């Protein structure tokens, strides 16, 4: 009877103690949600008090058996063979975290079984009360096994695994029973061993070792290359991607944080640092062969990929072969730095308890190491500052002589509407001519710049671009509605779609994303329209002055300079010239504000950040602030202001084209309409810029300078007040309506 009781405490029932369930339990039999061990009902010689005590004691045997079944099932590695044979037959997904938990449970059960053995030896050697001795020897396990049983029952029913399992164990650690707390902490320690191994794989080697999707760093759906069970599939997928393309995809959209698997005691900030560090190590471990071949300083010496002792042998690392070139992979992430990362993780792994502060400090240190070496790669080796300067030269029009020459060479072409099929090829001729005249051979970045002419949608009608010369009588007969229609059709210029592309090579794609380049392009198209408008106003000066001097010389020879017609023409000329001067004044000050107060000042701020910072993540943030400041301080993020500025530039172009296509400034009606619209828009612009909406923004310091230049003699302020009047006389050119 003694041995049957002891066997029941180890999970084996018999005649005295029976199991209400079938004894033929398979590995897949679910855990029972209630104790099924009980004393046989036909045993009548046991006192009710002893029966009650025995039934209480044998519950430990039931808990032991269920815990042992859970451990055996979780530690069973037969799924490896069955997965290779037929993956579809695996109904239950394996879990390395459950296996780690099972290892911890086995340790606790080993202590329990040794206690049973000690009780047996004690009872056989001495004459002692059986039930009292058993109860006294196993008393501490009544506070351990039932909570552990409830734990595995919850895990089985909820299919809890991975980070969710760590989170559950961490919550269970907060209890008032010291023995139970110690056991749960030991189980959590086993789970953390798996997590630290995965962290080592990710943060030392840059490889995601997570076959069962339990790590809080995971691949995006549809991009699971490393976790594929077939090595042939890995080779096929990697062969389709170049190193640069693969690292680009990995960096921007290859990996993400799985919130379901992120333990609550690991903050999101720390998880993001882990994600960044692993991605950075991937970049440093897998450089582009073309990038390696650019550096001839180092001797060409083939070297094996280093193994990190302490974690080697745990992971099946697969790497693409690196071409034997000048620069070595080890130069990007030195072995000493990899050892430093490994030692930090080993210190955490060997600690008996999880200390949140120590964990966060270690992650921050590893993130700083990765960011520093990534900074060294991108900023120093890849010459980031040179590329930033090139983007400033070409996308922000810092090379003004080049774009001035380009616009002059393409001026006649841009008077015609772009042709859908040949617009880009047509622009390449003036683009190449401008480069030959202004770009020196020492500019190694110009080869990365290419001109593009994407689809521009609405085509500008040639009749609107080349305004036919009309008689004054016909011009006076144009109605306001027809002028308005012409202006609305004119508002879309196909050449506004001119775009630049910049060729980005590994590893600069980590810094210059498509979003960043699109923001540069947005500013470029705006600045090019502005410079084109300024050039047309300047060309108008030269053209009209040449025309005026020719007429003046001709009239002087014929003594007509005092005639009423000549005086009337001079009045029209002066009135037109005042409008042109107002346009040029606004455009010139706007361009000076953008180039000097905005671009140059923000560029100097960015340069100081680049010199002071040695952290890649900080540098990305500084560059984003730089671009945001460019867009906000040029008002591209305010729809109302940007629309007014676009309208002003198009009115200026209309004004120039109308005058250049007229003799003696005869088309007075359309010029009056353009002048009136320009006054409205320029005064509206000044009113908006002075509004309280912009007063408290980061635009304020430089915006005040711009407003000071515009309103130097209070002209804009006085005219803006006139615009606010309900009834305002239509501005006319003096002398134009006397006819």
UniProtKB/Swiss-Prot annotation:
Its main location: cytoplasm. Pfam families: GCP_C_terminal, GCP_N_terminal. The keyword Cytoplasm applies. GO terms for cellular component: cytoplasm; microtubule; microtubule organizing center; spindle pole. Keywords: Cytoplasm, Cytoskeleton, Microtubule. InterPro entries: GCP (IPR007259), GCP_C (IPR040457), GCP_C_sf (IPR042241), GCP_N (IPR041470). The keyword tRNA-binding does not apply. It comes from the Eukaryota. One of its GO terms (biological process) is microtubule nucleation. Gene3D superfamilies: Gamma-tubulin complex, C-terminal domain. It is found in: Cytoplasm, Cytoskeleton, Microtubule organizing center. One of its GO terms (molecular function) is gamma-tubulin binding. Gamma-tubulin complex is necessary for microtubule nucleation at the microtubule organizing centers (MTOCs). Belongs to the TUBGCP family. This is Gamma-tubulin complex component 4 homolog. The lineage of its organism: Eukaryota, Viridiplantae, Streptophyta, Embryophyta, Tracheophyta. The gene is 85P.
